[in-house]
Amino acid sequence: MRKIYATGKRKTAIAKVWLTPGKGELSINEQSLNQWLGGHEAIKMKVMQPLLLTKQEQSVDIKAVVFGGGYSAQAEALRHGISKALNAYDIAFRAILKPKGLLTRDSRVVERKKYGKRKARRSPQFSKR
């Protein structure tokens, strides 16, 4: 019985994922998916997407530790980590996950604030007179 480790990232959120063959148990920060997310069905589907695409929702156990960012970024980091772990588990899943963009790290992050500006791009109000 092999244990596979992978990390997923999105914005400032980081997910550490351990995948083992099992019966479909999903533990995130020592909680079930429903306890961790509450009633956010769309975000739950994001997390489950790689498992549903590869039809592994009943055959692998996933233990994850997620920190940083908000719920949506954490869910996408978790999805990225699960996808990478499934790819390491069986290389045949790459053909399913890669076209959906689940193995690609979303590199969009917050733009830095520049001096002389109020935010990244917002300038102070201009007065002609």
UniProtKB/Swiss-Prot annotation:
Keyword Nucleus: no
GO (cellular component) term, any one: cytosolic small ribosomal subunit
Domain of life the protein comes from: Bacteria
GO biological process terms on file: translation
InterPro entries: Ribosomal_Su5_D2-typ_SF, Ribosomal_uS9, Ribosomal_uS9_bac/plastid, Ribosomal_uS9_CS, Ribsml_uS5_D2-typ_fold_subgr
PROSITE patterns for this protein: RIBOSOMAL_S9
GO molecular function, one term: structural constituent of ribosome
Pfam families named among the record's database cross-references: Ribosomal_S9
Keywords: Ribonucleoprotein, Ribosomal protein
NCBIfam families recorded: PRK00132.1
UniProt similarity note: Belongs to the universal ribosomal protein uS9 family.
Protein name according to UniProt: Small ribosomal subunit protein uS9
